[in-house]
A protein has these predicted regions:
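Short, flexible helix-loop junctions that flank or precede catalytic/ligand sites
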Residues: 1-186
Length: 186
């Protein structure tokens, strides 16, 4: 779904020689020399929560937790954020607002969610039309209005539909594009 790529590109943007970026992951998906990376190892009881606890001893500025799956990990992420660390992580939710619901369902008190959460980014990867065979077509006002509801947006002058060719193995699609929902908090 691209979560790791988004997390890593964000961390790479934030990482400088003066900033100590630490990660706890399961598994480490990309080795990055500018990060201090640690892998979850359940066989020695090193889970996400224990990893965050260990990382806090390394004086990190930024901590990336591969995934918040339970209250113990959420609590450690909250504690790290409360002590001045920027914490980035992933949660399995369908959209940005549901991330708050998910944290509350895990058992994080609402006042701690309010005190520590600075923003949520939800993302989806969608297929892109094959540039070799996509076909121009007339936009359908009814379909467009249903797609952009509840907003009113002008009908585009040109839209495309999939066709299929050798380049895309007759699917009409080639590649993926991220669609992001950003929900900042103040």
């Amino acid at each position: 779904s691209g979560k790791t790529t988004t997390l890593y590109s964000t961390l790479k943007t934030l990482a400088t020689k003066e900033v100590n970026v630490c990660t706890i992951e399961d598994p480490i998906e990309m080795v990055e020399s500018s990060f201090n990376q640690m892998q979850v190892q359940e066989n020695i009881d090193l889970n996400f929560a224990g990893g965050v606890k260990a990382l806090l001893r390394q004086d990190p500025d930024i901590i990336m937790i591969g995934e918040i799956r339970n209250l113990e990990t959420a609590d450690m992420a909250i504690q790290a954020a409360l002590t001045g660390h920027l914490v980035l992580s992933s949660l399995h939710t369908n959209d940005a607002p549901t991330a708050i619901t998910r944290l509350l369902e895990l058992g994080v008190p609402s006042y701690l969610v309010r005190a520590t959460l600075v923003g949520v980014v939800a993302q989806r990867l969608v297929r892109t039309l094959c540039p070799h065979c996509k076909q121009a077509t007339e936009p359908d006002a009814e379909v467009w209005n249903a797609m952009v509801k509840p907003w009113t947006l002008p009908l585009p002058k040109q839209v495309y539909k999939p066709a299929g060719c050798q380049e895309c193995r007759e699917t009409g699609f080639k590649g993926r594009q991220g669609i992001y929902e950003v929900m900042p908090f103040s």
